[in-house]
Amino acid sequence: MISLRDIVEKLFNSEDLNYKESYQLFDYFIKGQIELPLQTSILIALKLKQETSTEIAAAVEALLDNTKEFPKINGDLAGIVGTGGDGFNTINISTTAAIVAAAAGYKVAKHGGRSVSSKSGSFDLLESFGVNIELSPQQTKECLELYNLGFLFAPFYSEGFRYIKEARTILKTRTIFNILGPLINPARPNKVVIGVYSKDLILPMAKTLINLGIDRAVVVYGSGLDEVAIHDDTYVAEIQNNQITEYKVSPVDFGIDTYAIKDLEGGLPEHNREIIKQILQGKGKQAHNAAVAVNVAMLMKLYGKDNLKQNTQEILELIKSGKCYQTLQNVISFG
């Protein structure tokens, strides 16, 4: 076993960790074997030197090895998730997109937690709707199979997360745990859209996904947002057959107007709930509908539907029908 002292010494000297060292470090983290002051120092040291794809992949495996097992789902399973930490406090776009994608017929396992650095995390929102976020893995699987949608609350699956919550709250800034969050879904979706908070993270995240054996994915950075943007360009790394293709898309590629980022501003969970309820019931504002639709359209690309304009139009029509709200109601009733 590699000593924590040796690992910390390397980080404080701005040296990259190898796979074994990073795995060991995050095994220490998730088992509560690192004191709070040292936790914060390690997270800052990693951030300052910038995390490598090797460090991230090893950390993912360490955390997944310490999570509750989720029953295998037959067929394709999707994930739509952002790292968080983009600082804009928008409405919960990826969570809404997950619900809409499920209504469109795609099986989606949404993994996440409560807010760390924003006003409303995905599961703060879901709780405000009355979703039971602590269903057993078997119950969540049944919900997924019935309604195409299952919510996996990170602290329920990884009880060790309680050991790192205080450090993340104290720091109130983006850390490697923002990067790890989208990668440690116990349901292990094989088709994922992951938004990152920095353009510099696109390639490391894409390389990590390949290391983890994900067969189809896109990593997106939306000009400041950790999702596909409707205010400006979105930078994309698409993964297929272990190859990474980089490109850029803009609102015109989705056949939508360009909107201001302030049009997506959110607030506390109760405020966001009312906005998202309107979207799902077909009464949402154009900017809100568009933001959700482009993210689902990008997911559809992973299923062989390459026409982003057509995808977006299809989803906008579904949103306007109001049928998406029933999908959420089904999940609430199930719990």
From Swiss-Prot:
Keywords: Amino-acid biosynthesis, Aromatic amino acid biosynthesis, Glycosyltransferase, Magnesium, Metal-binding, Transferase, Tryptophan biosynthesis. Anthranilate 2 binds at residue 168. Binds 2 magnesium ions per monomer. Pathway: Amino-acid biosynthesis; L-tryptophan biosynthesis; L-tryptophan from chorismate: step 2/5. The keyword Metal-binding applies. Its EC number is 2.4.2.18. It is an enzyme of class 2 (transferase). It comes from the Bacteria. GO terms for molecular function: anthranilate phosphoribosyltransferase activity; magnesium ion binding. Belongs to the anthranilate phosphoribosyltransferase family. Catalyzes the transfer of the phosphoribosyl group of 5-phosphorylribose-1-pyrophosphate (PRPP) to anthranilate to yield N-(5'-phosphoribosyl)-anthranilate (PRA). Homodimer. This is Anthranilate phosphoribosyltransferase. The gene is trpD.
